Design a protein with these regions (language model features):
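Active-site catalytic microenvironments in core metabolic enzymes, especially phosphate/sugar-handling
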Residues: 1-175
Length: 175
């Protein structure tokens, strides 16, 4: 089993029979852009910590991401985030800062106006916001030439990757 494999490797590293693999790291960058579709308390704490470290927070119009204004809202966000990046800022474009963010209720109202409720509304939200964030991220990266980006949220990350044409990921270093 993999548990036995991990235990053996750890033991062999302790006894000096094998050396631990070299730690891979990413080269530092001056700026990064992050799209966040997670409303979890953990993500909210991470956003708060990033703000303390100098990231500019860009709250997104999530209701606009799920209704017929979607294309205009995303294109406007691309322009606004690019303007912040052009000023040398690292940016987190986010759909919420925790489970109590008022945008969650606003988004659900927008979906209810389209006749969507319950699980259908939840899945529609994940897809529309995720795809919108993917479009936003791709647009910002193309316009600015930034070399590093990140995304948060399980469903969000899936749709962002899909929207950006990502077909595979490879872990090369611990996070």
């Amino acid at each position: 089993s993999s548990g036995l494999e991990y235990a053996l490797v750890a033991y062999w590293e302790q006894t000096g029979e094998v050396s631990p693999p070299p730690m891979l790291t990413a080269d530092p960058v001056e700026q990064i852009v992050v799209v966040s579709g997670s409303c979890s308390p953990v993500t909210a704490d991470q956003i708060d910590a990033a703000e303390v470290e100098g990231f500019v927070l860009f709250p997104l119009d999530t209701a606009g991401f799920v209704d017929d204004r979607r294309d205009r809202v995303v294109e406007r966000a691309i322009l606004d985030v690019c303007a912040l990046v052009s000023k040398g800022k690292s940016v987190i474009a986010h759909t919420g800062r925790g489970p109590d963010d008022p945008r969650i209720a606003e988004t659900m109202v927008a979906l209810e106006q389209q006749g969507l409720t319950g699980e259908t509304a939840r899945m529609t939200t994940a897809e529309r916001i995720g795809r919108g964030l993917g479009h936003l991220l791709r647009g910002v990266l193309e316009e600015t030439g930034l070399r590093r980006a990140a995304t948060t949220g399980g469903d969000t990350s899936y749709y962002v990757a899909k929207e950006m044409g990502v077909t595979a990921l490879e872990a090369v270093a611990p996070m």
